[in-house]
């Protein structure tokens, strides 16, 4: 009966049904990822569910594309799922480079909260697909928005990896060992003598985590740069101006400056130890404000107007 009901819902409303299913997969994957900290065998289940989640999000977005007739990243609901798709893909790529159970532990809660927000918090009118306004009926929609969302995913992963470095090395003095190209990272001046309970996490390998954080942020920065360039070209094509200091544009530029400062610090080695890690970690909130905070104020060309809609 339950399976029959699921099939009916999947046929009637595949987008919402798959969205709920993705939420439950993440809900299952979270405790398994925590268990993997102490049991390496659980890591294979975490990767399996992460791959499944990534594929189901892709399938959901494909259904949305078919039903709406346009690329499924034109509203907040769609972009939230696209963001989680990007984060989960980045999680898998990072784990392939450095298979450490701490990586899904920091990524999955963000993915779960994002999907929960999309499923249960967003008003129904923001979940519905609608016809695009003339300015959005452009190939730049795919080129600009998808690149920006992938940049957010990469920057979030990089910031969370920096947070994990700080968490793992709590109360441990850190020293920056990276070269000007960012190869290397933090190392503890006094090696950590681990114990059997925490054995699956190699606490002396935070250098690799920091290196992956740097590389993720570098990828995100490059994508954000491309996003700003394509956005300016699209704006000129749609509205006749390259830059209008729209709140979203302004915060995207602030985010770009923020991470440019971080990369400058890493390349020049002007800062050492915890300070660049703290700087990168705080970047998570910069991205959060740029992506959600500005939009919800209901101001500018990029806004969704949710908060103002409630207040009115």
Curated annotation (Swiss-Prot):
Pfam family for this entry, one: Cytochrom_C_asm
Record-level Gene Ontology MF annotations: heme binding
Domain of life: Bacteria
Topological category with respect to the lipid bilayer: Multi-pass membrane protein
Ranges annotated as spanning the membrane: 18-38, 48-68, 73-93, 102-122, 148-168, 216-236, 250-267, 279-299
Compartment(s): Cellular thylakoid membrane
Alphabetical UniProt keywords: Cytochrome c-type biogenesis, Membrane, Thylakoid, Transmembrane, Transmembrane helix
Chief subcellular location: membrane
GO biological process: cytochrome complex assembly
Database matches in InterPro entries: Cyt_c_assembly, Cyt_c_biogenesis_CcsA, Cyt_c_biogenesis_CcsA/CcmC
Keyword Coiled coil carried by entry: no
One GO CC term on file: plasma membrane-derived thylakoid membrane
Family: Belongs to the CcmF/CycK/Ccl1/NrfE/CcsA family.
HAMAP family, alphabetized: CytC_CcsA
Assembly description: May interact with ccs1.
Known function: Required during biogenesis of c-type cytochromes (cytochrome c6 and cytochrome f) at the step of heme attachment.
Protein name (database record): Cytochrome c biogenesis protein CcsA
Originating organism: Prochlorococcus marinus (strain MIT 9515)
Gene behind the chain: ccsA
